[in-house]
Amino acid sequence: VKLSKELSLEKELIFLKNIDSDLKVALIANANLFLMPSRIEKKSVEGFGISFVEAASYGIASIGGKDGGASDAIINNKTGLICDGKDLNSIYDSVIDFFQNDNFINYGKYAKKFSENFHWDLIIKNYLKLIN
């Protein structure tokens, strides 16, 4: 919120919290981009990028930070982009690249296909193979 004020973007951005799942799905499904530039903050970081997989399941490609689980859920330059979440120029450049030449359309198609690797039935099947 503080950064949005510093950049005079308060009218361009909406910050939501505690939203229900129907609204979350509607917002994701109508997006062109899922952006979460994760970064390590006081040794705390997202372990796996389930949010990226969720967006991908709707055909929405992502830009994620190089720290944390984004690299497990995003194939750089195929299902989205990985950037330096601590560097505003890196984030900016990634957003510009994302929309250049309609890259986001192709990224979204690949992201949707890639998200199928994370369906629970497939994960359970693979775990059963490991223990048998």
Give the role of each language-model region.
Residues 18-19, 26-31, 127:
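Short alpha-helical donor nucleotide-sugar binding micro-motif in glycosyltransferases
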Residues 1-23:
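Nucleotide-activated donor-binding/catalytic signature segment of Leloir-type glycosyltransferases, i.e.
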Residues 1, 120-132:
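C-terminal alpha-helical cap of glycosyltransferases
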Residues 52, 57, 61-64, 74:
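Short hydrophobic beta-strand element within catalytic cores of glycosyltransferases
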Residues 90, 97, 103-117, 126-129:
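A short, well-ordered alpha-helix in the C-terminal region of glycosyltransferases
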Residues 29-44, 60:
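Acidic donor-binding loop of glycosyltransferase active sites
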Residues 76-77, 81-88, 96-102:
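Conserved acidic donor-binding segment of nucleotide-sugar-dependent glycosyltransferases
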Residues 39-49, 53, 71-72:
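Nucleotide-sugar-dependent
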